[in-house]
Amino acid sequence: MPLHKSAEKRLRQSEKRNARNRARKKELKVLVKTMQKLIEASAAKPEVETAYRSVVQKLDRLGVKRYIHANKASRKKSQITRDFNTYMQSAQQ
């Protein structure tokens, strides 16, 4: 328990930020899983493209705003793009 008024405020702020950060990371996880499920289910191209764009957009935003490390965002984007490109090539054939 904080002893000072300012420490109590910092604790409240920290808890709020922590909840906000967890929510943003959870959104990203849900988007990634949705895209992976669409790829596994061999969904229509437009659906997968839309999911891919939203995942990349979310990764960029979280990386720039430092909710996740920029290198992690870049690495995840690379992995997701690789999966997306593989799916698109197999869908064409």
Curated annotation (Swiss-Prot):
Ranges annotated as biased composition (Basic and acidic residues): 1-18
InterPro entries: Ribosomal_bS20 (IPR002583), Ribosomal_bS20_sf (IPR036510)
Organism taxonomic ancestry: Bacteria, Pseudomonadati, Chlorobiota, Chlorobiia, Chlorobiales
GO MF term set: small ribosomal subunit rRNA binding; structural constituent of ribosome
Domain of life: Bacteria
Main function: Binds directly to 16S ribosomal RNA.
One of the GO BP terms on file: translation
Name of the coding gene: rpsT
Ranges where the record places region Disordered: 1-25
Pfam families attached to this UniProt entry: Ribosomal_S20p (PF01649)
A cellular component annotation (GO) from this entry: cytosol
Key words, A-Z: Ribonucleoprotein, Ribosomal protein, RNA-binding, rRNA-binding
Species assigned in the record: Chlorobium chlorochromatii (strain CaD3)
Family according to the record: Belongs to the bacterial ribosomal protein bS20 family.
Disulfide bond annotation, renumbered to this chain: none
SUPFAM superfamilies per record: Ribosomal protein S20
Name the UniProt record assigns to this protein: Small ribosomal subunit protein bS20
